[in-house]
Regions:
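Acidic/histidine-rich catalytic neighborhood of metal-dependent amide-processing enzymes
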Residues: 200-203, 234-325, 329
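Active-site-adjacent substrate-binding region
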Residues: 311-424
Length: 433
């Protein structure tokens, strides 16, 4: 996610990266603030096109009332070897990760620029009726903060989970095996797989095939990797909050659904993305692997940092580069299933987590977050992003796990509460690719 600003010169890093940079061009879309660093990091980069993108932002931090605003988004041609240095500059100067997305071709980047407001096709919008209380209320009590904390602990015990380190590879393999173990009855409608990319770390996916409308899919995501300054292998980056907390939330929702023999009507996919911290590479690659499947995704939610309560508000919903109708649905779910929890609203800028990869291609996406943009966990991307930073409990993360379960069941059950029947048992489909 984001990074607390530190007063560190980038001269040495820039010099080394410049020397190592290749001449191979690549194309990125990048927000205004991050774009201001491009000339310093890569003087030979070229801005090819720019656009002011309309966004909705709160009239004041926390307010549900929104006002129309805009953010500049730019298409930049840059040497591929300079992207890690650009990432580092954004981390250190603007207390955030992401801020840009890498694209395979110039044409793809330009196409994203011209639809980055993410306006969905009308026929993709699902019903946002809250009408699956029987299923949701049966599953919510199964969610346990202790289970979430256990997963966070195990993930943060890796030296780091960097996308190109042996530790990052091992973390992906560990999660793959953990998710496989959540299907002990070998349900044949369940598939667990690793998704291979052009870098070392694999994304991990747990999916359940819908029993009825299996041409439509609901996606809950988090990112698996972590990052901190230092060597690829030696840097200590526990990433307990960023984003072991989100992955742990996904894991607990899967566990509860499997224990409750939940069978969705729509397909559901849980995805732990690789390489979020260096520009949303994993989610971008997965979105790009879906030609012909675009009209099947009816909703996306991202859990990225859920464990640190930075202020008195329980759940923050970020309104820029997300879908307003689904955001309202998320807020309505809090009122329906999490009574007493408060909701605030804020904005985080272009490309601040993996939901942006989906939003940029026109999919409906939302991003609930642990705190406001001013009060979140500033220890991320450091060796201090540990369980101790958020008090040694997963009580705050449990709120988001409950919200994610309610969201997924309400969308995946397609308004039919009777879908929580016993699941079919047979050999599961388990693959690695």
């Amino acid at each position: 996610m984001k990074l607390f600003p530190v007063k560190t010169t980038l001269a040495a890093a820039l010099l080394a990266a410049t020397a190592a940079a290749t001449a191979a061009p690549t194309w990125i879309t990048i927000g205004d603030k991050a774009h201001a660093l491009v000339a310093k990091v890569a003087p030979n980069a070229r801005t090819l096109a720019s656009r002011q993108v309309p966004v909705n932002v709160p009239v004041s931090r926390g307010s549900a009332a929104l006002r129309a605003s805009s953010e500049g988004v730019h298409v930049v041609e840059i040497d591929d070897g300079m992207l890690p240095t650009l990432s580092l500059a954004i981390h250190r100067n603007q207390r955030k990760c992401g801020g840009f997305l890498k694209h395979e071709t110039m044409a793809e980047a330009l196409a994203v620029l011209h639809r980055v407001d993410g306006a969905p096709e009308q026929e993709l919008a699902p019903s946002y009726a809250i009408d699956n209380q029987t299923i949701v209320n049966a599953l919510l009590p199964q969610l346990q903060a202790s289970n979430i904390l256990s997963t966070i602990t195990q993930l943060s015990n890796f030296q780091n989970r960097r996308y190109n380190s042996t530790h990052g590879v091992a973390a992906s393999d560990w999660l793959f095996n953990q998710w496989k173990a959540l299907n002990p009855g070998n349900r044949r409608d369940v598939q667990v797989r690793q998704i291979t990319h052009t870098w070392a770390q694999k994304s991990v996916e747990f999916s359940i095939i819908g029993s009825g409308n299996s041409t439509e899919t609901v996606i809950l995501g988090a990112h698996l990797d972590s990052i901190a300054s230092g060597g690829v292998e030696t840097a200590r980056a526990p990433g307990a909050d960023d984003d072991a907390s989100g992955v742990a939330g996904l894991t607990e929702v899967i566990r509860a659904m499997m224990a409750g023999n939940y069978v969705p009507k729509r397909n559901i996919r849980f995805i732990a993305y690789a390489a979020e911290e260096v520009g949303l590479w994993g989610s971008q690659a997965i979105v790009n692997q879906q030609p012909g499947r675009r009209d099947k995704v009816v909703g996306v939610m991202q859990l990225d940092m859920t464990a640190f309560q930075g202020d008195s508000t329980d759940i923050w919903i970020y309104t820029d580069f997300t879908n307003a109708a689904q955001n309202q649905f998320v807020a309505n779910l809090v009122g329906a299933y999490l009574p007493g929890y408060s909701v605030g609203y804020d904005a985080c800028g272009y490309g601040c987590s993996d939901h942006a990869s989906w939003h940029n291609k026109g999919f409906i996406a939302s991003f609930p977050f642990e705190a406001s943009d001013a009060t979140y966990n500033f220890q991320l991307h450091t060796p201090n992003d540990t369980i101790a930073t958020f008090g040694g409990t997963a009580n705050h993360a449990l709120k988001f796990t409950k919200l994610a379960l309610a969201w997924m069941v309400e969308l995946a059950s397609d308004g039919t509460p009777a879908q929580a029947q016993a699941a079919p048992a047979a050999t599961s489909k388990t693959a690695s690719r």
